Structure formats: C-alpha cells, structure tokens
C-alpha cells in the first residue's frame, strides 16, 4: 500500500521599505524660505515610516535607527522627543502545530497560529535613537516621529542624515533627508568721505551692507537710513546701489525728504 504523510514549514523572508521626511510648519509665515529651510532655534520634526511589503511574512527583531544627526541638530532632551506609532499589541504567530499521526494527511492542522505579544523599545544613542520591535507583520507600517532643534553650530549648513531599518530576516534599507539651516548675519558699516564739512558742502555717505554667515543667504533685505541732523537735506537721485564689484545694481529705492 502507498503511504502519505505531511509536514509544514514556514518560509519567512520579510521585505522592508523605509521613508524619511520632515515637516516645516514655519512655511506658513510666508517669509520666502524654501521647503527644507530652517532658522537657528527652530524645531525640525522628522518622520520615519517602515513597512513590511512581503505578504505572509513577519519581520523578526526589527531595528530602526537614525544615528547620523550632527551635534548641532541632536535629538531634543524631552522624554517625548521620540514617539512610535502603529506597533501592533499582538500578532498571530505561525507555529509548528498539533502533533499528528504518521502515514496520513492532516490538513485540519495546517497554518496554525498562536497569539504573540509584540514588544517595542526606544533607546537614545549618541545624537540619535534606536527603536527595536519584536515582530512586524505584512502591511503594518510603523512611524517614528522625532524632534530636533537647530543650533548655531550648524548655521549655514545643509544637513543630510539617514535613517535605516533591518531585521533578522530582512535586508537593510535606508532613506535620507536634507535640510538647510539659514540664519543670515547682517553687518552695516557707514562712513563719510571726510571728517569735517562747512556750510554748503556736499556730504557723501557710504553704507556697506554684508552678510557674514558662511552658507547663508539673506532675502528681501531692507536697508533704511534717516537723517536726524537739522539743516542737512537728502539730494534727490543721489542714492545708488552697487554690488561688491562696484557695478550699479537694480533695487527698489524709495526716497523721502529726510
């Protein structure tokens, strides 16, 4: 007689995806900044979303991290600076199943599962963080939100930092985002062509405006000068704007009596 017996195995190779982004609420101010542009002292709110794209699989011992933040954009010190959402409380975990008699088929014992609690741990390390999740089933996206504050030491820098994720049964994936910290530092120096004048002389003023912070760009700059001394009047059409090479530059010049 022909005998048959069955055995069940669980092939479990997860496929991870990762997406890193940031939010810039300061765009609402309408100050002409770019989407990825922040000022010194402003908060940068990052999001990292990791998902398991392989149907039927469970990513085991998933590790998500972002350890590439510079000192000037380190994770904030508050306890809620890192939060994790989307982690399931429990999963249905495949098991070997019920022992059955040999030399026969037992389809009623196929695909047995047990309920398994899912653990999630958040750890600070260096300037960043590590999140460990015990199990991540198919199409169960989890999101790590974390908050940093731009410091003076990174002013003028474009900061690219990278988040990554891997599991015991999934290859490592990475994603990066770039922000620019742009807090210009303006300097104004005003001089005259000579130290003394007599009645009827023409006084020639020279105002040099510079932006001193490397890597920064000042936008929509307004330079204003008011003559406070009685008896001194501004000559119409005498205001000329020149660039650093001495070439006359276009500008919106508004001239009043003083």
Predicted regions and their residues:
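Exported/extracytosolic protein signature
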Residues: 1-258
């Amino acid at each position: 007689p022909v005998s048959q017996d069955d055995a069940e195995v669980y092939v479990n190779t997860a496929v991870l995806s990762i997406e890193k982004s940031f939010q810039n609420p300061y765009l609402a101010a309408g100050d002409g900044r770019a989407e990825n542009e922040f000022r010194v002292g402003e908060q940068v709110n990052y999001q990292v979303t990791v998902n398991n794209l392989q149907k039927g699989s469970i990513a085991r011992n998933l590790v998500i991290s972002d350890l590439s933040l510079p000192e000037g954009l380190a994770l904030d010190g508050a306890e809620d600076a890192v939060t994790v959402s989307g982690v399931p409380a429990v999963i249905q975990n495949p098991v070997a199943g019920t022992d059955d008699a040999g030399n026969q088929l037992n389809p009623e014992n196929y695909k047995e599962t047990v309920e398994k609690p899912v653990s999630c741990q958040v750890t600070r390390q260096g300037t960043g963080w590590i999140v460990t999740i015990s199990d991540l089933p198919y199409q169960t996206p989890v999101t790590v939100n974390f908050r940093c504050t731009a410091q003076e030491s990174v002013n003028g820098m474009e900061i690219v930092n990278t988040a990554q994720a891997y599991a015991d049964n999934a290859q490592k994936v990475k994603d990066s985002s770039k922000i620019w910290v742009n807090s210009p530092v303006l300097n104004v120096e005003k001089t005259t062509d000579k130290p003394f004048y007599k009645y009827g002389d023409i006084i020639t003023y020279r105002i040099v405006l510079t932006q001193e912070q490397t890597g920064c760009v000042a936008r929509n700059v307004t330079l204003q000068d008011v003559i406070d001394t009685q008896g001194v009047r501004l000559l119409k059409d005498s205001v000329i704007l020149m660039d650093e090479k001495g070439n006359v530059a276009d500008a919106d010049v508004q001239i009043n009596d003083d």
